[in-house]
Each structure stands twice: as C-alpha cells, then as structure tokens.
Regions:
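Exposed beta-sheet edge/beta-hairpin loop segments within beta-rich domains
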Residues: 117-134, 141-151
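Beta-strand/loop nucleic-acid-binding surfaces
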Residues: 105-123
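Beta-strand elements of well-folded, non-transmembrane domains
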Residues: 42-44, 140-142, 162
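Short intrinsically disordered coil segments
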Residues: 54-59, 118-121, 169-180
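OB-fold ssDNA-binding interfaces and closely related basic DNA-contact patches used
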Residues: 1-103
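Acidic, gly/ser/pro-rich intrinsically disordered tails
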Residues: 1-9, 164-187
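OB-fold/S1-family single-stranded nucleic acid-binding modules
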Residues: 145-165
Length: 187
C-alpha cells in the first residue's frame, strides 16, 4: 500500500460504517448542486482514524488560511468555524447507529470509486447500502462560501470490507411473511 504524503487526505479504518449512501447517483440537497455523498460513522474506539482526521483538519485550516480570512484581517480560530468531525452522542442522541461514534459527511461532484475488500470494482448497486462497513478515502479542505466559513470533507473512494445490518431500512418481504403459520392463510 502506498504511503499517503498528503496531510489533508485520510483513509479511515475498516470499522467505519457507511450511512446515507448516495454513491451511485448524485443527489441534490436543498436544491443545491447534485453530489455523491456518504456519512461515515467512526467508532470512538478507532482512535487512529479520529486522530488522522483531526490532523488533516488542522492541515486544511493552515493551508486554507487565506480563504478563511476572506476580507477580514485575521483568520477565525479553528474552534469558531464549521468542523466536519462531529460527535454522534451529542448531535444524534436518538440514533443508535451514531452512539459512541464520531461522524463525518463527505461528498463529491464526481462519483467515487467503489471497490470490495480485495480492490475489485463493485458494480452491483445492492452491494453498497447504508449499514455496510468499509474504508473511505476523504480529502479535508477549507471553504468560504458567501461568508460561511469552515472545513469540509471531499469523498474520493470507498472500499467495502464487510456487510452490516442495514440502517433505516424497512423489513424484507421474507422476514415479514416467512414465519407465519400457513394454517391461518385465507381463513
């Protein structure tokens, strides 16, 4: 595996869970430009990934100081601008998928590459869904859009490692009807 020399690029750990997967078709949020996106749920126990993201955020902040300064004379402190690394326990307390985890929303105008655990391209859409586990390649960058300042994450590529319980999905027909007693049918 190649050594990453870009301080704003992060490859997450294999226990990262994907949610809100929009990796096959770009989706418009609030009427904006359609983008490919995923919410990356990172266990708090994965301290290596969390530290890599924090380090990349600091590097993006330093690299983007001129952009973050805007028309002002000073750069706002990092703690005063939008940060992509968010605490699931605080921001999504009612969602068990985000318990004891951080999350990062990453998006891109271009489709991410999506591969399996041995780097073969995944072409079957049903193989990638909200709830799978895998690694993600993200790039962290500073932005200043109409005075809205912060650090954001671009989505580069995804590697599915293993299946997981689907998130936010409905029950399958098999699970709804597979255990019913046939004696009651049409009675």
């Amino acid at each position: 595996m190649a050594k990453n020399m870009n301080p704003t690029k992060v490859i997450t750990g294999k226990d990262t869970r994907w949610s809100y997967c929009n990796v096959w078709d770009a989706k418009s949020i609030n009427g904006g430009t359609p983008k490919y996106s995923v919410s990356l749920i990172i266990p708090k126990a994965d301290t290596a990934t969390v530290q890599k993201i924090r380090t990349a955020i600091e590097a993006a902040y330093r690299d983007g100081e001129s952009k973050l300064r805007g028309n002002g004379k000073t750069v706002p402190p990092l703690v005063a601008i939008k940060n992509p690394l968010r605490d699931g326990d605080t921001e999504r307390p009612d969602d068990p998928a985000y318990a004891n985890a951080y999350f990062v929303n990453a998006n891109s105008a271009t489709a991410p590459g999506v591969v399996d655990a041995v780097c073969n391209p995944i072409l079957t859409r049903s193989e990638v869904y909200s709830g799978v586990y895998g690694r993600a390649s993200i790039s962290v960058y500073a932005f200043n859009s109409n005075g809205n300042l912060g650090i954001a994450c671009g989505l580069n590529n995804l590697q599915k490692i293993r299946d997981g319980e689907p998130l936010g999905s409905r029950a399958s027909a098999e699970s709804d009807f597979g255990n019913e007693d046939d004696e009651d049918f049409l009675s």
